[in-house]
């Protein structure tokens, strides 16, 4: 394996990881921001109030984006196994 092939594998793995995790992280971020603004406006300082909506938002985003994330991950895995002989013997 050459340096270029290792870097290409690492780049593709990081790209797939970011593509899969980004919808979940963005939904948790937006939900946390909205709940924090609500808590600041109403002066409610309850820790569980910010935790429960984040879990719900992540679960909803898994339901919405789950099939897309599964297609991305299975395509990457298929490509990785298809090119396995090239990766190990070059």
Swiss-Prot record:
InterPro entries: Bac_export_3, FliQ
Domain of life assignment: Bacteria
Cellular compartments per GO CC: bacterial-type flagellum basal body; plasma membrane
Transmembrane segments: 18-38, 52-72
Keyword field: Bacterial flagellum, Cell membrane, Membrane, Transmembrane, Transmembrane helix
Keyword match Membrane: yes
Covalent S-S links between cysteines: none
GO BP terms in the entry: bacterial-type flagellum assembly; protein secretion
Subcellular location: Cell membrane; Bacterial flagellum basal body
Membrane topology recorded in Swiss-Prot or TrEMBL: Multi-pass membrane protein
Keyword Transmembrane in annotation: yes
Function according to Swiss-Prot or TrEMBL: Role in flagellar biosynthesis.
UniProt family annotation: Belongs to the FliQ/MopD/SpaQ family.
Protein name, UniProt field: Flagellar biosynthetic protein FliQ
Organism: Buchnera aphidicola subsp. Baizongia pistaciae (strain Bp)
């Amino acid at each position: 394996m050459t340096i270029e092939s290792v870097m290409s594998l690492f780049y593709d793995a990081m790209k797939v990881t970011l593509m899969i995790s980004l919808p979940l992280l963005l939904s948790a971020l937006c939900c946390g921001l909205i709940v924090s603004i609500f808590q600041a406006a109403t002066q409610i300082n309850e820790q569980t109030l910010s935790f429960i909506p984040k879990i719900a938002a992540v679960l909803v985003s898994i339901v919405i984006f789950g099939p897309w994330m599964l297609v991305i991950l299975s395509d990457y895995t298929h490509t990785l196994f298809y090119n396995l002989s090239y990766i190990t013997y070059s």
